Amino acid sequence: MAIIIGIDPGSRMTGYGILQQTGDKLTYIDSGTIRTDTKEMPERLKRIFNGLTRITQHHLKYADEPIYTAIEQVFMAENPDSALKLGQARGAAIAAMVALDLEVSEYTARQIKQAVCGYGAAAKEQVQDMVCRILTLDFVPQQDAADGLACAICHAHSSHSMNKLILNSAMRGRGASKKKGRWRLTEEDLGNLR
């Protein structure tokens, strides 16, 4: 079991989504946005940092399982000023997570869309719709919050796939045997996995 916090950074609005992963099952916990309505960039960064810190600390209090964070990588915008502001907002979000001793994984927008929609160039509305379907939500989250949830879903799929690869590699190197296309663990392997 794990808690995954997905972050969609933005200089005016940062979206976040929080899920619980239990094996293949994803359960919605929370989502929302941190709005930075001020014109001053340092104040915006402070609001992003403080908002994500407060939200994460709240969930850290109640979590018995490990917490992982995932954030969308910066894309190269046509406007260099926009790309710099987005990079700064992303930096504030990463700093907030690292200050809480949380590991941060990064994914491109294409990777996130591919994981959620099966198509790396999906529109924002498609991502929003698929997030609702995957998590069986009875409401539609705001787009930036849906993007945060999509980032968390992407991390869940990536980490679950990676865990399977690691387990398969460990079994191949040990006394496990393959029977009818499946790996059979020895008693020693089972003991090492506990």
Swiss-Prot record:
Cofactor(s), by name: Mg(2+)
SUPFAM superfamilies the UniProt entry points to: Ribonuclease H-like
Molecular function terms, GO-annotated: crossover junction DNA endonuclease activity; DNA binding; magnesium ion binding
Subcellular location: Cytoplasm
Gene Ontology CC, one term: Holliday junction resolvase complex
Binding site for Mg(2+) 1: D8, D144
Cofactor binding description: Binds 2 Mg(2+) ion per subunit.
Transmembrane stretches, start-end: none
Highest taxon listed in the record's lineage: Bacteria
The protein's Enzyme Commission number: 3.1.21.10
Pfam families: RuvC (PF02075)
Keywords tagged on the record: Cytoplasm, DNA damage, DNA recombination, DNA repair, DNA-binding, Endonuclease, Hydrolase, Magnesium, Metal-binding, Nuclease
Reaction catalysed by this enzyme: Endonucleolytic cleavage at a junction such as a reciprocal single-stranded crossover between two homologous DNA duplexes (Holliday junction)
Function statement: The RuvA-RuvB-RuvC complex processes Holliday junction (HJ) DNA during genetic recombination and DNA repair. Endonuclease that resolves HJ intermediates. Cleaves cruciform DNA by making single-stranded nicks across the HJ at symmetrical positions within the homologous arms, yielding a 5'-phosphate and a 3'-hydroxyl group; requires a central core of homology in the junction. The consensus cleavage sequence is 5'-(A/T)TT(C/G)-3'. Cleavage occurs on the 3'-side of the TT dinucleotide at the point of strand exchange.
HAMAP family xrefs: RuvC
Name of this chain's protein: Crossover junction endodeoxyribonuclease RuvC
